[in-house]
């Protein structure tokens, strides 16, 4: 199996039928949110485009992005790693180690200059000349710059590479730095999350291989196809938010009924991600469905934004559960206040008019 083979050629060699291949393309189009009309375009790309070499680097991180990636169901990670791409370097997954691993990295960079994708998990620390993270006897930041020099594009996996994450939380003693602040001359796509959703990760790769370009990005560099909506927008608990039905404390009656978690710190209203639509573990669940509020892990600096259990802000709404007496009482108080204010303004105007009249009619003294 070589990088010059196409995905379809690899699939055929593995005994996959044409029908199964087209089914795969259809599922991929659906997973990317493109619809069935793009099935033929994806099939054509898989049949004609050679497998792209990918180098996957690891800096300061916990490897949760890799753990998420290997659990992708649409497409299956085995299809991505063994057929769609040529994963030439990943020190977590590859069999080679030491000098052999470093030789594989150098060989791919030399043979495919300008034609490989660099995926980065984790970030480089810059304090002490980068000595807080050593790969192959050298600072990781040096390996990053070396691999990025001839890369076609860079994918920043997870919040570590995209924003800095916990390593960059105050006071950030190692000066952990997001990839885009170190590499400034390459197209970079950010896929934040701690970790990102598996199907989001494989979906980004599939899109880039199919269309030969980065997906449309938002102003922060994230793919709009997965980060254009707040979790709150599609959350199944949203009707409870609109109704004013909230969990006041964990394990109260509202929690048992599945009410909105906003008051116990859910960051869904300010977090852009696909958790409430794609979900996790092959679409099984996501944190809010499990009873815990969103912590906003795909947003920049979420570690430094206060407690995960502090509400974002107070809200003032009746909610459809408010009864007529409550609403009527509130309206009556408001009306009474308005009448009092009107009376006060009228009294001031009368007093001002009286003073002006008195000044006008007073006779002048003779000198």
Swiss-Prot record:
Lineage top rank: taxon: Bacteria
Catalytic activity: H2 + A = AH2
Co-factor: note: Binds 2 [4Fe-4S] clusters.
GO molecular function: 3 iron, 4 sulfur cluster binding; 4 iron, 4 sulfur cluster binding; electron transfer activity; ferredoxin hydrogenase activity; hydrogenase (acceptor) activity; metal ion binding
Main location (coarse class): membrane
Alphabetized UniProt keyword annotations: 3Fe-4S, 4Fe-4S, Cell membrane, Iron, Iron-sulfur, Membrane, Metal-binding, Oxidoreductase, Plasmid, Signal
UniProt cross-references to InterPro entries, sorted A to Z: Cytochrome-c3_hydrogenase_C, NADH_UbQ_OxRdtase-like_20kDa, NiFe-Hase_small_C_sf, NiFe_Hase_small_N_sf, NiFe_hydrogenase_ssu, TAT_signal, TAT_signal_bac_arc
SUPFAM superfamilies in alphabetical order: HydA/Nqo6-like
Signal peptide coordinates: 1-45
Protein's membrane topology: Peripheral membrane protein
Family: Belongs to the [NiFe]/[NiFeSe] hydrogenase small subunit family.
Function: This enzyme recycles the H(2) produced by nitrogenase to increase the production of ATP and to protect nitrogenase against inhibition or damage by O(2) under carbon- or phosphate-limited conditions.
Name by which UniProt lists this protein: Uptake hydrogenase small subunit
Organism: Afipia carboxidovorans (strain ATCC 49405 / DSM 1227 / KCTC 32145 / OM5) (Oligotropha carboxidovorans)
């Amino acid at each position: 199996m070589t990088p010059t083979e196409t995905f379809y050629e690899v699939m055929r060699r593995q005994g996959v039928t044409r029908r199964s291949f087209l089914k795969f393309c259809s599922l991929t189009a659906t997973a990317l949110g493109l619809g069935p009309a793009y099935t033929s375009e994806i099939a054509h790309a898989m049949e004609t485009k050679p497998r792209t070499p990918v180098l996957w680097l690891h800096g300061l991180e916990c490897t949760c992005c890799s753990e998420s990636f290997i659990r992708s169901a649409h497409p299956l990670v085995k299809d991505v790693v063994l057929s769609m791409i040529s994963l030439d370097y990943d020190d977590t997954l590859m069999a080679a180690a030491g000098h052999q691993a470093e030789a594989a990295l150098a060989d791919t960079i030399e043979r495919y200059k300008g034609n490989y994708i660099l995926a980065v998990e984790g970030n480089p620390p810059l304090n002490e000349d980068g000595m807080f993270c050593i790969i192959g006897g050298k600072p990781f930041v040096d390996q990053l710059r070396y691999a990025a020099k001839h890369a076609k594009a860079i994918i920043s996996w997870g919040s570590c590479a995209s924003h800095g994450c916990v390593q960059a939380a105050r006071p950030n003693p190692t000066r952990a730095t997001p990839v885009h602040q170190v590499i400034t001359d390459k197209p970079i796509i950010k896929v934040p999350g701690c970790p990102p959703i598996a199907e989001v990760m494989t979906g980004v790769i599939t899109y880039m291989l199919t269309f030969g370009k980065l997906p449309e990005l938002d102003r922060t560099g994230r793919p709009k196809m997965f980060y254009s909506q707040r979790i709150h927008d599609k959350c199944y608990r949203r009707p409870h938010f609109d109704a004013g039905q909230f969990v006041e404390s964990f394990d109260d009656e509202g929690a048992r009924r599945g009410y909105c978690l906003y008051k116990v710190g859910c960051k869904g209203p300010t977090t852009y991600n696909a958790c409430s639509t794609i979900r996790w573990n092959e679409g099984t669940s996501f944190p809010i469905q499990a009873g815990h509020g969103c912590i906003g892990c795909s947003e920049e600096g979420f570690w430094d934004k206060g407690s995960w259990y502090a509400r974002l802000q107070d809200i003032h709404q009746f909610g459809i559960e408010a009864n007529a007496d409550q609403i009527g009482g509130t309206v009556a108080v408001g009306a009474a206040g308005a009448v009092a204010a009107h009376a006060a303004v009228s009294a001031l105007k009368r007093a001002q008019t009286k003073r002006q009249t008195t000044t006008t009619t007073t006779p002048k003294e003779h000198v």
